[in-house]
UniProtKB/Swiss-Prot annotation:
<dbReference type="InterPro" id="IPR017452">
    <property type="entry name" value="GPCR_Rhodpsn_7TM"/>
</dbReference>
<dbReference type="InterPro" id="IPR000276">
    <property type="entry name" value="GPCR_Rhodpsn"/>
</dbReference>
<feature type="transmembrane region" description="Helical; Name=4">
    <location>
        <begin position="142"/>
        <end position="162"/>
    </location>
</feature>
<keyword id="KW-0812">Transmembrane</keyword>
<keyword id="KW-0675">Receptor</keyword>
<feature type="transmembrane region" description="Helical; Name=7">
    <location>
        <begin position="559"/>
        <end position="579"/>
    </location>
</feature>
<comment type="function">
    <text>G-protein coupled receptor which binds to the neurotransmitter dopamine with high affinity leading to the activation of an associated G-protein and downstream signaling pathways. Couples to G-proteins to inhibit adenylate cyclase (AC) activity and cAMP production. Antagonizes the D1-like dopamine receptor dop-1 to negatively regulate the rate of locomotion. Negatively regulates locomotion through the activation of goa-1 subunit proteins which inactivates the unc-77/nca-1 and nca-2 ion-channels in the command interneurons.</text>
</comment>
<feature type="topological domain" description="Extracellular">
    <location>
        <begin position="80"/>
        <end position="96"/>
    </location>
</feature>
<keyword id="KW-0297">G-protein coupled receptor</keyword>
<feature type="transmembrane region" description="Helical; Name=3">
    <location>
        <begin position="97"/>
        <end position="117"/>
    </location>
</feature>
<feature type="topological domain" description="Extracellular">
    <location>
        <begin position="163"/>
        <end position="182"/>
    </location>
</feature>
<feature type="transmembrane region" description="Helical; Name=6">
    <location>
        <begin position="524"/>
        <end position="544"/>
    </location>
</feature>
<keyword id="KW-1003">Cell membrane</keyword>
<dbReference type="GO" id="GO:0007195">
    <property type="term" value="P:adenylate cyclase-inhibiting dopamine receptor signaling pathway"/>
</dbReference>
<feature type="topological domain" description="Extracellular">
    <location>
        <begin position="545"/>
        <end position="558"/>
    </location>
</feature>
<feature type="region of interest" description="Disordered">
    <location>
        <begin position="402"/>
        <end position="435"/>
    </location>
</feature>
<dbReference type="GO" id="GO:1990834">
    <property type="term" value="P:response to odorant"/>
</dbReference>
Length: 607
């Protein structure tokens, strides 16, 4: 590519000539040797290591092949030309081959870097599409074919006689056609160079935006952790409240049994016989045998659910005393309800500070639309309960429910999992509607807040199950309720996004794209360094080469650039072919391991 080699007389000092010959004779052969050795390592590493066989690395192999050909077919002629005192003695054919190889391989290096830049742009800008369609060997082969086809097309005119050698001066082999030099420099270097700079600018801007989005997601994650803590805290308080009500109710029932001199016996239900028999035996140890009296049941408590049946046997003369005990029991339960309802409302008020918009999406955080409304509902229910009177109790056999061991687990699980809500003032009662109405069933009703439970939140969509259906289903569990609310939460959040109606990629594809994106980020940094080094090495030569061609077009007998600057810039460009393998070794761990395995004949890999 030297376009001014006839200016060899620029070096006039004999001392400078000697120093130049010594330096050129020692150091110039090292450049093609390093280029051949390093690029062969790159090619072998990609074909030996399966983990390196990616689209990007296939393009890197194409770049290594072009650098290898520069070292073999261009630098070797350059060393010979310099050692022969810049006199070409191989004839016009080899001169044209030398020039064509120089132009073709240099153009291929530039276009390979452009293809790599396009590959980086697709991988960073559209990671899911790249993981689906871009990471295929066929696309890499198409890119490589286009690169080498254009490079050969650019260099082909040199073989067709565009730059003929003068018959009277066969000792010089130079690119003397200024028009070809200018056009080839613009289309082979400057246009691809500008395109690569634009692409890498967009790539790094995308990476910066992605980093900012990652920081925002981390901030939102901390806020979500607070919300999760509030949810867990509210669920824990609800479980503690239910457990306390259950234990306290059982304790009060036992106290009533002792106060009325009654003792529990087995009911008609055979399922509970094995459960309550130890309790009966314990009472029989303390109480003497008596003649059975007509019995009646204790009215159901509105603040707790029904439980497996136990029968309370009592004397007729204890009816009045029993009614007084029942009133004390109701007052005690109301006091406990007041205490723990205030506590749970305070906890819900704290959790609301993290986002009141979750009321509709997650109704299990707070059952009402506001804390104030919950308190109003609490006072209204309490006043309604206080005005309820006991029905006339007749001395006949009735039952009251106490949880069995088997049902207690189901009751605890369902009561912890099901949401309680109140919306638009509509109430749906799932417990005993009246203290005088008697229940003889298994424990399917639950402890609840303020005696009411709303199922409207589960009936918003026609395809959802109602709360009654869920209660009737014995297999209803915590995972069922969480699945309902996760689906509702996802739909509510997806409507807020712009592309909620687009088909979502599979989870496997997202994980693959995420992993691919991390790897592409590292590869992008490495290839950005390769591009920077390439520009540093080749930009001086092409600037001087274009300037010299413009000067020759203006005046055929004068050149703007001297021989020595152009000669040094040419070898600086050749040096780039030796630096690329060093860049891969420094910045890419996989290439470094592959180089070490090749140089050690696989010893490190076997270990």
């Amino acid at each position: 590519m030297l376009a001014g080699q006839h200016h060899v007389t620029d070096i006039e000092s004999p001392l400078m000539v000697v120093l130049w010959r010594v330096a050129a004779g020692v150091f110039l052969p090292l450049v093609p040797t390093m280029a051949v050795f390093g690029n062969v390592l790159v090619i072998m590493s990609v074909f030996r290591e399966r983990s390196l066989q990616t689209v990007t690395n296939m393009l890197i192999v194409s770049l290594a092949v072009s650098d290898f050909m520069v070292a073999i077919g261009v630098m070797s002629f350059g060393v010979y030309y310099e050692w022969n005192d810049f006199k070409w003695g191989l004839g016009s054919f080899f001169c044209h081959v030398y020039q064509a190889l120089d132009v073709a391989c240099s153009t291929a290096s530039i276009l390979n870097l452009l293809a790599i830049s396009l590959d980086r742009y697709i991988a960073i800008g559209h990671p899911i599409s790249y993981a689906q369609y871009g990471a295929r060997g066929g696309r890499a082969m198409i890119s490589i074919t286009i690169v080498w086809g254009v490079s050969v097309a650019v260099a082909l005119p040199l073989l067709l006689g565009v730059n003929p050698m003068e018959e009277n001066d066969l000792q010089e082999c130079e690119l003397a056609n200024p028009y070809f030099n200018m056009i080839s420099s613009i289309f082979s270097f400057f246009i691809p160079c500008i395109a690569m700079i634009i692409l890498y600018t967009i790539i790094f801007r995308r990476l910066r935006q992605r980093e900012r989005a990652r920081s925002l997601r981390q901030a939102q994650r901390s806020e979500n952790d607070k919300i999760s803590s509030a949810l867990l805290g509210g669920a824990q308080i609800a479980r503690q409240m239910g457990k306390h009500f259950k234990n306290r109710t059982d304790q009060i029932l036992l106290e009533i049994s002792f106060q009325t001199s009654s003792f529990p016996t087995m009911s008609e239900s055979s399922e509970d016989a094995s459960t309550i028999s130890p309790m009966i035996n314990s009472f029989n140890n303390f109480l003497p045998k008596k003649t059975p009296y007509p019995s009646t049941s204790i009215p159901a408590i509105p603040e707790c659910g029904s439980m497996p049946n136990l029968t309370i046997i009592e004397r007729p003369e204890a009816e009045k005393e029993k009614e007084i005990s029942i009133m004390d029991l109701r007052d005690t339960v109301e006091m406990l309800d007041d205490k723990y309802s205030s506590a749970i409302l305070t906890s819900f008020q704290t959790s609301r500070s993290f986002g009141e918009e979750l009321e509709e999406i997650l109704p299990f955080i707070d059952g009402s639309n506001s804390v104030k409304h919950s308190r109003e509902q609490l006072h209204t229910t309490r006043s309604n309960t206080s005005t309820t009177r006991l029905l006339d109790v007749k001395p006949e056999l009735r039952s009251i429910s106490v949880p069995s061991i088997q049902d207690e687990k189901k009751l605890s699980q369902k009561s912890n999992d099901l949401p309680f809500s109140h919306q638009n003032g509509t109430h749906k009662q799932k417990l005993l509607p009246n203290p005088g109405i008697l229940m003889k069933s298994k424990s399917t009703t639950l402890l609840k807040t303020n005696g009411y439970m709303d199922t409207d939140s589960l009936n918003r969509n026609s395809h959802k199950k109602s709360l009654a259906d869920l209660l009737a289903n014995d297999e209803f569990s915590f995972s069922d309720s969480m699945r309902v609310y996760k689906n509702r939460l996802f739909k509510s959040l997806s409507r807020a996004t712009s592309g909620w109606n687009k088909p979502r990629p599979s989870r496997h594809m997202v994980k693959k794209a995420t992993k691919q994106m991390r790897r592409e980020h590292k590869a992008t940094v490495t290839l950005a360094v390769v591009l920077a080094v390439f520009l540093f090495c080749w930009l001086p030569f092409f600037v001087l080469h274009l300037s010299n061609s413009i000067c020759l077009i203006i005046d055929e007998n004068s050149a703007c650039v001297g021989f020595l600057p152009l000669y040094l810039a040419t070898w600086l460009g050749y040096l780039n072919s030796s630096l690329n393998p060093l860049i891969y070794t420094v910045f890419d761990q996989r290439f470094r391991n592959a180089f070490r395995n090749i140089l050690s004949c696989g010893i490190f890999k076997k270990r």
